[in-house]
């Protein structure tokens, strides 16, 4: 309908009463249109597309909105109060969901896409109007047609009369004769919908519309594909999209992720998010390339467990993830984000065996192994698994190897991982995501004010850490026990892309908890490059080669404390005699390789890699385990 960036609400200049009322002044004010899944119809001043509610003064007298309330609960003790202004006869006004403290025309609650009931009350608390809003598809609305009937609208009209084509509802959703998952070549899939409807299908990933192929006969499966279908009928809006990935003669024993979307959103030569595009700098890392964009595109995300049972099926937002090395690989890392506007604001499934308590995620990452891509394909996740499976006091990321398909095309082996952010910390530690402080590298803020860690690191670097009083003060603010495990593992790994890089740390809030490090991106470890010796002196690397960087200097200062120095060296020795011993480390490597080795030839072939390179890196990693 339009974009209204200049103001977060609309007013313009005929609704039949939905609930008969005695007071004619009240009776003329009505909820005339509602959108519970706004993707593109209306934009607020900060670039968001929130839910919205339209009111209409259908009478001949002005209505003073002062004291009126809007709520989605029948007995709401704290309903939202409309602004103190008047609505002229025939005038419409649109209110948007949002933080009501930020603007008087933003109501402080969200609308349920699966259905909602709205209550409009006058200053005395009497019910003026109630509207039961059914489940709505994206960018559809529900409201009052010119004849007074309640109808669905495929083209909403916020701030104006609902004069676009009105519909009775949605066509029934098509039903497939076969569930998503494994299928043999030659299998037929039948599709049915309600009588009098026409079914349209697609097999290239895009959501079908009325221009898509008309279904007239069973779909025969010859190869892995994503089958999607909608139904249309007279007087009805198109149905919801039915979607199923059929994994035809798929040999892998790993879980499978299927992503599907309109091919152009990812692969259009000029516009596709996955592509280099027309504006890329020709020099590495190709700033300006499409894959550097922060843009999100909607994709259908299906997750199949190792038994080919579909455990997740929802639409999420996708963007390219990662830093310079990762984004410039031909297999790019992907970030998946659940959004309420797509029907669910969380992804719910226990993806990570070593973190069984984690069953809800705001974001997931499909990682390509970064600098270890088409090399060892194991380095980073190996150390996270060592930490998790051996109880190290480090904040690490869950890991699950998955085979990925995009629009039915094999996309290779990827790592399903958690995304480090405030939601990740909330789900792992039970902290308030709005209060948590997260910094990275040289005290650059991700969330919260950096002054607090700045003061801590300055104190550490300017005070004698062997003084018990000084050390106790630091111990009250910094989780030293966790720091010891974190530095011990990073230094054993021989990580040369650290401490000046790949470093994040957090605390629950300004007034509570201690700072802790978050471990991630250990790709440049275990002799990845020829110039990194297996017997790398990690103390020299941290204290001399990385001298001057904040976290190297924190470590140097703490080593000045007799107790810390003893605890650190003892802990490092304990780890090297247990999980980091030749036997313990080799056992974990073998366990992880057992999961993924069978997939490597197909993965390397897909990305034009040399499987011989992978074999060389496995030998290097085994040598590292033996002599490090």
Enumerate the language-model features and the residues they cover:
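Cysteine-centered motifs
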Residues: 6-7
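Bacterial N-terminal signal peptides
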Residues: 11-21
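Activation on beta-sandwich/Ig-like modules and their edge loops
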Residues: 27-153
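Short, compositionally stereotyped local motifs that mark structural "simplifiers"
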Residues: 30, 85-89, 95, 136-317
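Residue-level detector of buried hydrophobic side-chain packing
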Residues: 31, 53, 90, 118-120, ...
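Middle-to-C-terminal accessory/interaction subdomains
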Residues: 130, 159, 255-281, 285-294, ...
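Short, conserved helix/loop micro-motifs enriched in His/Cys and acidic residues
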Residues: 330-337, 344-381, 459-477
């Amino acid at each position: 309908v339009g974009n209204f960036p200049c103001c977060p609400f609309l007013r313009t200049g005929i609704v039949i009463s939905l609930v008969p009322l005695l007071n004619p002044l009240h009776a003329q004010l009505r909820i005339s249109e509602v959108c519970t899944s706004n993707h593109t119809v209306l934009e607020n001043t900060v670039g968001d597309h929130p839910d919205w509610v339209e009111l209409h003064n259908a009478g001949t007298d002005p209505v003073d909105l002062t004291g009126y309330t809007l709520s989605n609960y029948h007995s709401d003790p704290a309903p939202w109060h409309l602004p103190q202004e008047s609505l002229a006869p025939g005038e419409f006004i649109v209110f948007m969901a949002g933080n009501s403290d930020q603007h008087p025309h933003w109501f402080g609650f969200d609308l349920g896409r699966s259905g909602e009931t709205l209550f409009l009350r006058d200053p005395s608390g009497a019910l003026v109007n109630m509207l039961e809003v059914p489940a709505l598809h994206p960018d559809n609305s529900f409201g009052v047609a010119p004849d007074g009937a309640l109808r669905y609208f495929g083209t909403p009209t916020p701030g104006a009369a609902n004069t676009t084509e009105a519909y009775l509802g949605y066509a029934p959703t098509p039903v497939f004769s076969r569930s998503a998952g494994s299928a043999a070549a030659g299998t037929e899939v039948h599709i049915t919908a309600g009588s009098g409807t026409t079914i349209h299908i697609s097999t290239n990933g895009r959501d079908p519309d009325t221009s898509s192929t008309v279904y007239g006969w069973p779909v025969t499966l010859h190869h892995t594909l994503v089958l999607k279908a909608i139904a249309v009928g007279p007087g009805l809006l198109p149905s919801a999209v039915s979607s199923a990935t059929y994994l035809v003669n798929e040999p892998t024993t790993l879980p499978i992720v299927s992503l599907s979307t309109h091919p152009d959103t990812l692969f259009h030569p000029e516009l596709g998010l996955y592509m280099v595009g027309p504006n890329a700098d020709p020099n590495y890392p190709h700033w300006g390339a499409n894959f550097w964009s922060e843009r999100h595109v909607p994709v259908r995300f299906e997750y199949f467990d190792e038994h080919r049972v579909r455990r997740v099926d929802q639409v999420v937002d996708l963007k390219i993830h990662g830093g310079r090395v990762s984004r410039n690989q031909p297999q790019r890392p992907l970030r998946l984000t659940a959004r309420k506007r797509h029907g669910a604001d969380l992804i719910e499934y226990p993806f990570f065996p070593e973190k069984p308590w984690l069953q809800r995620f705001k974001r997931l990452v499909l990682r390509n192994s970064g600098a270890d891509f088409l090399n060892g394909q194991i380095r980073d996740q190996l150390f996270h698994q060592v930490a998790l499976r051996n109880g190290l006091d480090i904040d690490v990321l869950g890991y699950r190897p998955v085979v990925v398909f995009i629009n039915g095309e094999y996309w290779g082996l990827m790592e399903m991982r958690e995304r480090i952010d405030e939601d990740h910390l909330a789900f792992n530690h039970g902290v308030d995501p709005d209060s948590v402080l997260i910094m990275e590298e040289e005290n650059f803020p991700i969330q919260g004010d950096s002054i607090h860690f700045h003061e801590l690191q300055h104190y550490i670097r300017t005070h004698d850490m062997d003084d018990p009083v000084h050390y106790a003060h630091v111990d009250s603010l910094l989780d030293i026990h966790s720091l010891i495990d974190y530095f011990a593992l990073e230094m054993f790994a021989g990580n040369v892309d650290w401490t000046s890089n790949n470093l994040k740390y957090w605390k629950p809030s300004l007034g509570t908890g201690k700072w802790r490090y978050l471990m991630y991106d250990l790709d440049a470890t275990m002799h990845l490059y020829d110039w990194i010796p297996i017997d790398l002196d990690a103390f020299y690397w941290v204290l001399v080669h990385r001298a001057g960087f904040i976290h190297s200097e924190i470590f140097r200062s703490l080593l000045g404390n007799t107790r810390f120095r003893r605890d650190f060296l003892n802990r490092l020795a304990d780890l090297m005699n247990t999980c980091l011993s030749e036997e313990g480390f080799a056992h974990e490597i073998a366990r992880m390789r057992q999961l993924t080795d069978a997939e490597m030839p197909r993965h390397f072939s897909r990305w034009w890699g040399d499987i011989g390179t992978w074999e060389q890196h496995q030998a290097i990693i085994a040598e590292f385990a033996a002599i490090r």
